[in-house]
Amino acid sequence: MDTKTLIANDIAKVVPELDQETIYNLLETPKNSDMGDVAFPAFSLAKVLRKAPQMIAGELAEKIDAAQYEKVMAVGPYINFFLDKSSISKEVLEAVIKEKANYGQQHIGDGQNVTLDMSSPNIAKPFSVGHLRSTVIADAIGHIYSKLGYNSIRINHLGDWGKQFGMLIVAYKLWGDRATVEANPIDELLKLYVRINAEAEENPELDEQARQWFKKLEDGDKEAWDLWQWFRDESLVEFNRIYDKLDVSFDHFHGEAFYNDKMDEGIQILEDKNLLKESKGAQIVDLEKYNLPPALIKKSDGATLYITRDMATAMYRQRTFNFVKNIYVVGQEQSHHFKQLKAVLKEMGFDWSDDMIHVSFGLVTKNKKKLSTRKGNIIRLEPTLDEAVSRALTQIEAKNPDLENKEDVAHAVGVGAVKFYDLKTDRDNGYDFDLEAMVSFEGETGPYVQYTYARIQSILRKADFTPNEETPYSLNDAESWEIIKLLQGFAANIERAAEKYDPSIIAKFAIQLAQSFNRYYAHTRILDESEERDSRLALCYATAVVLKESLRLLGVQAPEKM
């Protein structure tokens, strides 16, 4: 039981007016450690008990059983709890040493399936830093949910269908050359895509041709299909190379095209329930009762839209995986689309539509400007990762020129730096892409956390220390206490990150833990012979375990030496 739950239970025994959960949510952490470790504000009881909060705090502090605390005291309208440092540090260190990487593991999910719709790059377009967010946020959410006992199923919903393929086919037939494309597929296809978009602005006829070619593709025309398959195969070679560098893998590559033969069922259900209405030759579903505009299901030319395919996708996933959560990690600009999708599925009678969650995220910009594939204004991810690794290697060679496996460590640090920087940003916020800031060993960065972990491993090697599960390690100084409280809160942070679908909670926790350890390291002579030496080393060991596991949840490696 974590200390906040323990305190909430003890307060509930003397405050029947509030339930344990309400009390738990009211508990605060004082800004000044002199005011205790946990505080309960008595304001909420003033109306009920018809007394001043200060008086209530004083009376309750007297009634609470203080035997398991260092002390309990009222300060103004607050009841302040000072925890027993020695006994809690003993419990926490014992738990981490015993459970190791399983520390913080929970069984909330009990093997239930969570599907993650993620990454979803567009075929025939370069993999840019814009795709990074969906990829790494969803991968981290997958690790976090697995830590809670769920079975995380990662699905790459490739952008391999849509009018853009009509555009690309028209561009290729007008200006393309097979040998040129095969020599450098993504770059050449991007040139064609940018050119057709620019020319279509001046010549709307090209747009119409693109629509016709996409309709041919939907109807199974051989020439259209062969070109599409070729574009797809060439693109996947590059994508898989990048996923290997990112150390991200998928359980399924089900692109939009996978659902082409699965859309009729959804449309049939809409027809059977008389939900389809005609509007200007197109077919729509009225969503007025959800305060949403009508959902366009089929265009007047019979071509389907994203929502039609996403209906089929959701139905397939529910039937195949029986998910308890179907999570879509997709940018904020798709928010309206997912509201409509959920509403249409609800109208179709699928209660599981409530389990569909759109996890949105903010934009990545460069010099505060939006990136756009259509305008050719993008940052390619692969050369960016290579540059990050190169910068990491330069810093490693300066710090530790004799390090073995320098290239492997540089890869872990460089790629980890890019991922960590993305993940430490509050999910709903965007960020400006700054490689220099990402790869810095100072500040709130991935390399800073990795370097702290490697520093601890160096201390443990010097001391030749391996903790003993039977030894009662405990500490009661202020510096170690800050670390102990963080270690104790690891499981609660994992739960909160899952509840909010936000890995930045884990990234910020890792930064805070690394900072607390480095303060401890600066003020404590860990290796000096003393009664507390082994307990201090046990604290180092426990910190390293939790730092490494925090990084793993984010999909970032923790090198043993740097």
Swiss-Prot record:
UniProt-listed Enzyme Commission number(s): 6.1.1.19
Molecular function, one GO term: arginine-tRNA ligase activity
Motif 'HIGH' region, residue range(s) on this chain: 121-131
Signal peptide span: none
GO annotation terms (biological process): arginyl-tRNA aminoacylation
Similarity-based family: Belongs to the class-I aminoacyl-tRNA synthetase family.
Protein name from the UniProt record: Arginine--tRNA ligase
